[in-house]
From Swiss-Prot:
Positions where Phosphoserine occurs in the chain: 178
Species of the source: Saccharomyces cerevisiae (strain YJM789) (Baker's yeast)
Protein name (record): Nucleolar protein 16
Subcellular location: Nucleus, Nucleolus
UniProtKB keywords: Nucleus, Phosphoprotein, Ribonucleoprotein, Ribosome biogenesis, rRNA processing
Length: 231
């Protein structure tokens, strides 16, 4: 037997305060553009999809930085350690030698920006040499076409299809006058002829206070359709 308070709460129209589960992230279907919808990967984020399609999610630089591309990262340390200590020592020596050789190759003065420098060290950490950069950030004598060709990235197939879609001519659809509008224009023409000023001040027919220019455009279109020659 429940108490009076419980029975009153059950009859009340106010819902009970239950625990609210976390809303699941809704996957929105891309319907605005058929080309993007056909190439959209729902397992990726919006920024990742835009990058894959060759587009930009934001015109400006993102404030929080960019997502690191881990596909190009080469791990030099093995995931599992070898069983034998001798093999481990040999692998460590090979890794150090590879790191030293890679550092030697990467230090190119023509690839380092002007005003910066890179320090090259040996296996013990001692400074071997300092490489000063000679790469200019902007060369005024450089050809503009070379700069554009260097900065432009290769267009993807999706971008080419979108550009082809955008370059299609737009077919202009002419507005057709309704039957009621034609009847209204016919009444105005029979009453005032080509005097658009009187049409403008006609309070009974021009109830929506259409301007003289608007009335003239409508009547010229109506005359052209009905084959009426202006006086």
């Amino acid at each position: 037997m429940t108490s009076v308070r419980k029975r009153k709460m059950n009859r009340s129209s106010v819902g009970k305060a239950t625990r609210r589960n976390k809303d699941k992230q809704r996957k929105i279907n891309i319907q605005s553009n058929p080309i993007i919808a056909a190439n959209w990967d729902y397992s990726l984020t919006m920024a990742q999809n835009y990058k894959k399609l060759g587009l930009r999610a934001k015109l400006q630089t993102p404030a929080g930085g960019k997502e690191a591309d881990l596909s190009k990262v080469v791990k030099r340390i093995p995931l599992t350690k070898p069983v034998l200590d001798e093999d481990e020592d040999e692998d460590e020596g090979e890794d150090e030698q590879n790191d030293y050789n890679a550092a030697t190759v990467e230090l190119d003065e023509n690839e380092i920006p002007e005003g910066e420098a890179r320090i090259q060290r040996d296996k013990n950490g001692d400074v071997v040499r300092v490489v000063y950069g000679k790469k200019k950030n902007f060369d005024a004598d450089e050809d503009v076409n070379k700069i554009k060709a260097r900065d432009t990235t290769e267009e993807t197939e999706v971008v080419k299809k979108l550009e082809e879609l955008a370059s299609r001519p737009v077919i202009r659809k002419e507005r057709c006058q309704s039957e009621r509008e034609e009847e209204w224009l016919e009444k105005l023409y029979k009453k005032h002829g080509d005097d658009y000023k009187k049409m403008f001040f006609d309070k009974k027919l021009n109830i929506y206070q259409q301007s003289e220019g608007d009335l003239k455009r409508r009547l010229l279109r109506w005359k052209k359709r009905n084959g009426i020659v202006s006086k």
